[in-house]
Amino acid sequence: MAKFIKSGKVAIVVRGRYAGKKVVIVKPHDEGTKSHPFPHAIVAGIERAPLKVTKKMDAKKVTKRTKVKPFVKLVNYNHLMPTRYSLDVESFKSAVTSEALEEPSQREEAKKVVKKAFEEKHQAGKNKWFFQKLHF
């Protein structure tokens, strides 16, 4: 079977706390690891997507509405639904590792790096579908 869950692929979480949220796969583990002996992926996703902005809104409101709240997580392949979309993960790939997920302070640092990268992509107008709320 071809490996279609690759780094940079956008997926949707279908189970758990983040069900219905869009994620991008940072590092896939097809064979599993010693600590997690099942196929899984380290993902970075959007917990709260940015809201719509209009011209008549003042700068303070625009900055508040364009904030992205990210999360980083280890997710079983069974709980991911891959999409046809992809996203560049090189800007935060080194920060989001399995070691960073173990330690709470490193996890927070990884989230900050991901947040900065996601907000830059959103401001640039790239990957519009990824930054929209999934309506279902």
Swiss-Prot record:
Q: Which PROSITE patterns match?
A: RIBOSOMAL_L27E
Q: Which GO terms describe its cellular component?
A: cytosolic large ribosomal subunit; small-subunit processome
Record GO terms (molecular function): structural constituent of ribosome
Q: Which keywords accompany this UniProt record?
A: Cytoplasm, Ribonucleoprotein, Ribosomal protein
What CDD domains does this protein map onto? KOW_RPL27 (cd06090)
Q: Which GO terms describe its biological process?
A: translation
One matching Pfam family: Ribosomal_L27e
Q: Where in the cell is it found?
A: Cytoplasm
- Write out the function statement from the record: Component of the ribosome, a large ribonucleoprotein complex responsible for the synthesis of proteins in the cell. The small ribosomal subunit (SSU) binds messenger RNAs (mRNAs) and translates the encoded message by selecting cognate aminoacyl-transfer RNA (tRNA) molecules. The large subunit (LSU) contains the ribosomal catalytic site termed the peptidyl transferase center (PTC), which catalyzes the formation of peptide bonds, thereby polymerizing the amino acids delivered by tRNAs into a polypeptide chain.
Q: Which family does it belong to?
A: Belongs to the eukaryotic ribosomal protein eL27 family.
Summarize subunit and interaction data from the UniProt record for this chain: Component of the large ribosomal subunit. Mature ribosomes consist of a small (40S) and a large (60S) subunit. The 40S subunit contains about 32 different proteins and 1 molecule of RNA (18S). The 60S subunit contains 45 different proteins and 3 molecules of RNA (25S, 5.8S and 5S).
For this protein, the record's PANTHER family field holds: 60S RIBOSOMAL PROTEIN L27
Protein name, UniProt field:
Large ribosomal subunit protein eL27
